[in-house]
């Protein structure tokens, strides 16, 4: 295989073990690797951008494997990708990788994931992009996740991988030896019991910590292969999940399923 130009980011920051393992795995296969990632933890920032303050970037090659070019950026994961693609990287990447996230990115949680947002920036620019997450905060199979991410992306990029499709890979919290087979999956719909812990600062003013817990995982009902398991169900079976995601959120159901609206004596149709 000819070497690929690979751009890597994450939302856990430049010091995270996951991104360093992924970058090392890509470099070990002979690819040209550039890392542009946040200089600190930026989890759950979604696709947010920094517009009210400057974005700074500093070289961080010493934190990564030999041959990896790295930048630590003061912005969000989406900022990092934009800065990389339009300012820091000389040549357009062949592949964008985001991760390895310290924790799962399953179901509709992808909407708040900085890891998925970084990969989505690549997808929006017409670059094949894959997000990869270790589906546990304690058990982190980073090497196994990195190897699988590279196997999947190297094969997919030479296969039928549409430009507008992001691949979201989650690795189960188990040893590689007992891990089941990889399958294509659907996004589940995650429902939370949103809880806030209210406290007082030394001046008596209230502040809050968000501490929601998942209470339900529902099967999605959209178009697509009906025999695919949900990503959550796949992880519960100790099997890796691979979910295709596209940036087009447009609803494609029948017109009759939409709310009937009438404004100024005219029906909306």
UniProtKB/Swiss-Prot annotation:
Catalytic reactions on record: a ribonucleoside 5'-phosphate + H2O = a ribonucleoside + phosphate
Molecular functions (GO terms): 3'-nucleotidase activity; 5'-nucleotidase activity; exopolyphosphatase activity; metal ion binding; nucleotide binding
Protein name: 5'-nucleotidase SurE
Entry's family note: Belongs to the SurE nucleotidase family.
Species whose genome carries this gene: Synechococcus sp. (strain CC9902)
Gene Ontology CC terms: cytoplasm
UniProt KW Hydrolase keyword: yes
Taxonomic path: Bacteria, Bacillati, Cyanobacteriota, Cyanophyceae, Synechococcales
Matches recorded under Pfam families: SurE
Cellular compartment(s): Cytoplasm
Alphabetical list of HAMAP family matching this protein: SurE (MF_00060)
Protein origin, superkingdom: Bacteria
Cofactor binding description: Binds 1 divalent metal cation per subunit.
EC number: 3.1.3.5
InterPro entries: SurE, SurE-like_Pase/nucleotidase, SurE-like_sf
PANTHER family recorded: 5'-NUCLEOTIDASE SURE, 5'_3'-NUCLEOTIDASE SURE
Keyword terms of this UniProt record: Cytoplasm, Hydrolase, Metal-binding, Nucleotide-binding
Job of this protein: Nucleotidase that shows phosphatase activity on nucleoside 5'-monophosphates.
Residues where a divalent metal cation binds: 11-12, 43, 101
Top-tier EC class: hydrolase
NCBIfam families to which the protein is assigned, alphabetical: PRK00346.1-4 (NF001490), PRK00346.2-2 (NF001492), surE (TIGR00087)
């Amino acid at each position: 295989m000819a070497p690929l130009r690979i751009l890597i980011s994450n939302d856990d920051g430049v010091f995270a073990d996951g991104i360093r393992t992924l970058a090392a795995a890509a470099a070990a296969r002979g690819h040209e690797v550039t890392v542009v990632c946040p200089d600190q933890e930026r989890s759950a920032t979604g696709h947010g951008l920094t517009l009210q303050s400057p974005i700074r970037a500093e070289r961080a090659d010493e934190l990564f494997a030999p041959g990896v070019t790295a930048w630590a950026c003061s912005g969000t994961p989406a900022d990092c990708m934009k800065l990389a693609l339009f300012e820091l990287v000389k040549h357009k990447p062949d592949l964008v990788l985001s991760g390895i996230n310290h924790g799962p990115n399953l179901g509709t949680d992808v909407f708040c994931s900085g890891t998925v947002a970084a990969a989505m920036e690549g997808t929006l620019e017409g670059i094949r992009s894959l997000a990869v997450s270790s589906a546990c905060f304690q058990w982190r199979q980073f090497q196994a996740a990195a190897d699988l991410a590279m196997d999947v992306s190297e094969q997919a990029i030479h296969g039928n991988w549409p430009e507008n499709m992001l691949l979201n890979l989650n690795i189960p919290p188990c040893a590689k030896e007992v891990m089941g087979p990889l399958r294509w999956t659907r996004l589940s719909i995650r429902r939370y019991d949103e809880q806030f812990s209210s406290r007082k600062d030394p001046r008596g003013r209230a502040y809050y910590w968000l501490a929601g817990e998942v209470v339900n995982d529902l099967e999605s009902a959209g178009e697509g292969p009906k025999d695919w398991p949900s990503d959550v169900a796949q992880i519960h079976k100790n099997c890796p999940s691979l979910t295709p995601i596209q940036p087009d959120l447009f609803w494609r159901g029948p017109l009759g399923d939409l709310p009937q609206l009438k404004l100024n004596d005219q029906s909306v149709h």
